[in-house]
Amino acid sequence: MAAASPSTSDAAERLARLVQRLRRLVRGELILAGGHARLQPQDETDVATALELARELAVPVRFGGVSGGLHAVLAGHADSSRGGLPGLQIDASSHLTRAARFEGTRGMIEVQPGVRLADLNRLLQPHGWWLPIETHPESGATLGGLVGLDAVAAAPAWGTLADRLLGIDAILDDGTRQLFGPFGERSSVSLNSGRAGQLVSSLFGIAAGVQADIARHWPPGQRVPDGYLLDAFHPRPQRPYTPDGSVNLAHLLAGSAGTLAWSARLHLRLLRRPAVSRWALFLQPSAAAALTHAPAVLALQPSAALLLDAADLRRLLGSRHPDDQALCRLAGIGPDMSGRPDGTQQGEAGPAAWLVRFSGEADADVQAAHRRLTALLDPRRQESTTGLALQTGGGLQSHGRAAAGDVQPVWQVLLGERVSPTSPPSACIIPLLPQDPATLAGLISALDERLASQGVQPSWRGQVAAGELQLVVPEGAGPKARQALAATLPPRWTPALREAFVEVRRQFDPTGILLGGLMTARH
């Protein structure tokens, strides 16, 4: 067996000292496994103590047990050289699971980071509210993890979790506690330490230095998984995070994937649950052909607009659940994936499909939206053009609930997978950073052509409304696909913005101990 490197040996010794001290100082459980330690804190004091000692001993820290398997691109260029060193994982999912201060009249609630999304929405359902994030039914995603990702809703009007944040009670890398919330003359938020005051002053300075870059180059209405939400300091009319366009410092923590601070308590603004939702499926000859309709589809303001690939369609066709069977019948799709609109032929890239939902308070309005969508995507379709009313728990409202046992409808699984992907990036599944939906058709056509010239047959899937697609290629074609992406996609950030992201990270975590959540990193 090879001897451990000096750096690894030193890190293991520092971790052992940390664990020894934590056992005397915290109430939560400490678990040692695989050369790492995991703390399941009983309260926020445990977290503050652990962070303060980890910084003192230079032990890397990850925030785990909060993402429900959801992957993220880590922001701020965390130090990958520390990634393999023995470290501490802080896991909120066991004990920090309380929801409090629910205001049913105004739709506001305070939660700890370990609260599961499914549990929260189950609690809110009788009151007519929900947090409009939809994940895989079995993901177990928690609020801390979803805020760390700035998880996106299926409908553009519902925004991302940053749009739902009123404030975050945060714990910084040295154990300092600070409420990140509205900032300004009308705000009641006070900076309760010298560290917090210096940090906030530095952040405003960083944002001021890139104000022109934000105005010219910031992608409106999209997540920023490869940076930090510096546009929170310079709200724009087309995408304000707050109703009055003021600065809320909590938005900077959204999407930071655990690289800036621990989110101890989340103050959330909820959304009224829509009274009616209807779904429809439309077969298209290819992803590129489907995406030519993206601007027109999104102009109809759907509450979900998903692009499915041939593998997704096979899953729907193979399902025994009545919801899935009804969707395929409505689209006129047979086992051979026949049923393409007149005048189209199956492209070499294989068929694709739109899976679209409209939601609202009046069923007549929702049905009218589906009729307009049908006229756009499949004018041949004469009957059942008003969509299917599918319940979240499965079963068809419009056709009566058929016995399906405990089988999960595939459409519901696809909704979670496409809106909040649970499969980490791999050699064959490559997530694109968010793009302007209006440009997707041209981008996908260019990439398809480039990949086809190299003998690679791609497929595409994802959430079109958010501009977030996954490129799926055959095994072994991943390197070619990544090269094609690098050659085709334009630079996302200016040098000044990239440097600003690094400086934000340094101001929050000058010693570089916060390595983010237990998610796949991209550096």
Segments the model singles out, each with a brief description of its role:
Residues 30-33, 39-41, 60-65, 90-92, ...:
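General beta-strand structural signal in soluble alpha/beta enzymes
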Residues 72, 138-147, 312-316, 321-324:
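Beta-rich nucleic-acid/ligand-interaction surfaces
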Residues 99-100, 118, 126-289, 511-515:
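FAD-binding subdomain of flavoenzyme oxidoreductases
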